[in-house]
């Protein structure tokens, strides 16, 4: 496959003001995308964003580029990433564009695309956009310029879609839930979904100012949510990330329930009701305990590369319906075409209500193995620390010493200049020692 110049594992992402996250590039990207989709005929493109301040700047630039290429533009404003995937389908648009850097701080931003089916763009379309980015920009004749309009009922449409993922008889009366919206794209829609289903809702971090997205809140900083659940005597807490495609939860004791545990709760419920199609897709980072617990239920399990696009690709290839990551990306194909945090959390609550147990009790049904993850920064290094002979040798030695009762995984982040060192096994002290040893070696190789 041709090497991509601009697109990473999940679109294009980086620091605002540094290439390619600049207004000039976004103008050209809008034009290139518009030209690529125009090759299929007249086209409409949806554009949505999260709440970071730079989103307004990039929205305007993309809008101008798309219009210059002759593509019509529908602006959604701040909306969760999965909402943009859904609305792209329902508006029969040729594509959807999301302006977001997901769980990253406000000073980062990025772009990702959805196809007209609400799925990741095919590789050939990405490559066509890449080629056009390096071509001279042209402008359509005046009468052929794209028209731009704003969709004012997008939030209401998506709220109804989320509610449609649960039976019409669903009533969350008696359920008290704390929701942390990360000052992000779910801040309007998520509280309304749960309120309209009858839950008592306490809302945290739903006052976006353009700079506070993901700051000490949401699924990457769960401390405030944990404290609020205990203080409010709530049944559970739900923590979303800035663009609403990942979710972690908190049980009534204030304990975090991660993506592996949430995935297991949903999968087990589907399996017990005879509704599980095939098996479950995890990733290389999924806890060994998840694999073992699913095996006890005779549920097939496979690991994809890290990243929701790889989970989705594996699900499509196997014609399975459910998969996810321990970070909280959970894909329920029976309801949505991509990871959807609100829909995933609704499926967890439904599973708990069917089984009659609390989130705390459900969490304990999955016995996780100790897993230590250490991030090592490597900026400007010409050496690939993952494939370096001394690092490979050390990984092989540690794997041999764990004698089949653990795993070692080294991988480079697709979005940040990090090497992730993960060691997993039965003895936490031993696992930590191995992880620290390998991380130290990786840092030395990078230096």
From Swiss-Prot:
Key word S-adenosyl-L-methionine present:
no
For the modification Phosphoserine, the affected residues are 102
InterPro entries for the chain: A-D-PHexomutase_a/b/a-I, A-D-PHexomutase_a/b/a-I/II/III, A-D-PHexomutase_a/b/a-II, A-D-PHexomutase_a/b/a-III, A-D-PHexomutase_C, A-D-PHexomutase_C_sf, A-D-PHexomutase_CS, Alpha-D-phosphohexomutase_SF
- Which top-level enzyme class is recorded in the Swiss-Prot or TrEMBL entry? isomerase
Q: How is the cofactor bound?
A: Binds 1 Mg(2+) ion per subunit.
Q: What EC number(s) are associated with this protein in UniProt?
A: 5.4.2.10
Concerning PTM, the database record says:
Activated by phosphorylation.
Mention any Pfam family matching this sequence: PGM_PMM_I
Residues of the active site are: 102
Q: Which cofactor does it need?
A: Mg(2+)
**Catalysed reaction per UniProt?**
alpha-D-glucosamine 1-phosphate = D-glucosamine 6-phosphate
Biological process (GO), any one: UDP-N-acetylglucosamine biosynthetic process
Known role: Catalyzes the conversion of glucosamine-6-phosphate to glucosamine-1-phosphate.
Q: Which PANTHER family match?
A: PHOSPHOGLUCOMUTASE (ALPHA-D-GLUCOSE-1,6-BISPHOSPHATE-DEPENDENT), PHOSPHOHEXOSE MUTASE
Which NCBIfam families does this UniProt record tie to the protein?
glmM, PRK10887.1
User: Could you identify this protein by its name?
Assistant: Phosphoglucosamine mutase
* The organism of origin for this protein: Pseudomonas syringae pv. tomato (strain ATCC BAA-871 / DC3000)
């Amino acid at each position: 496959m041709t090497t991509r110049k601009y697109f990473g594992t999940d679109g294009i992402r980086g620091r605002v003001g540094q290439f390619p996250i600049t207004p000039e590039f976004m103008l050209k990207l809008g034009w290139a995308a518009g030209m690529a989709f125009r090759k299929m005929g007249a086209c409409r493109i949806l554009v949505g964003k999260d709440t970071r301040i730079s989103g307004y700047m990039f929205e305007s630039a993309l809008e101008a580029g798309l219009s210059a290429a002759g593509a019509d533009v529908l602006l959604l404003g701040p909306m969760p990433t999965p909402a943009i995937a859904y609305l792209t389908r329902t508006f029969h648009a040729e594509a959807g564009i999301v302006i977001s850097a997901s769980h990253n701080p406000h000073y980062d931003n990025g772009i990702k695309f959805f196809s007209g089916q609400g799925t990741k763009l095919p590789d050939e379309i990405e490559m066509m956009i890449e080629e056009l980015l390096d071509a001279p920009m042209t402008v359509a004749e005046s009468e052929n310029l794209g028209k731009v309009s704003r969709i004012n009922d997008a939030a209401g449409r998506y709220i109804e879609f989320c509610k449609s993922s649960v039976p019409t008889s669903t009533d969350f009366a008696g359920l008290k839930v704390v929701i942390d919206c990360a000052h992000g794209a779910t801040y309007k829609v998520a509280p309304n979904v749960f309120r309209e289903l009858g839950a008592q809702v306490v809302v945290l971090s739903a006052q976006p100012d353009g700079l506070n997205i993901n700051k000490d809140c949401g699924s990457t900083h769960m401390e405030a949510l944990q404290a609020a659940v205990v203080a409010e005597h709530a049944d559970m807490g739900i923590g979303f990330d800035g663009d609403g495609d990942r979710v972690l939860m908190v049980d009534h004791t204030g304990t975090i329930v991660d993506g592996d545990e949430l995935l297991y709760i949903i999968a087990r419920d589907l399996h017990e009701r005879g509704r599980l199609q095939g098996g479950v897709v995890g990733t290389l980072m999924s806890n060994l305990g998840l694999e073992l617990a699913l095996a006890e239920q005779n549920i097939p399990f496979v690991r994809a590369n890290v990243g929701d696009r790889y989970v989705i690709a594996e699900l499509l290839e196997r014609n399975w319906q459910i998969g996810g990551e321990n970070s909280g990306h959970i894909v329920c194909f029976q309801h949505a075409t991509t990871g959807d945090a609100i829909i995933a959390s609704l499926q967890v609550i439904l599973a708990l209500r069917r089984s009659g147990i609390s989130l705390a009790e459900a969490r304990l049904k999955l016995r996780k193995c100790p897993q230590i993850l250490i991030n090592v920064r490597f900026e400007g290094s010409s050496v690939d620390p993952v494939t370096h002979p001394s690092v490979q040798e050390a990984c092989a030695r540690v794997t041999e010493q764990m004698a089949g009762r653990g795993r070692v995984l080294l991988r480079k982040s697709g979005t940040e200049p990090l090497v992730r060192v993960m060691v997993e096994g039965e003895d936490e002290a031993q696992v930590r020692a191995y992880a620290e040893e390998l991380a130290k070696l990786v840092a030395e190789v990078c230096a």
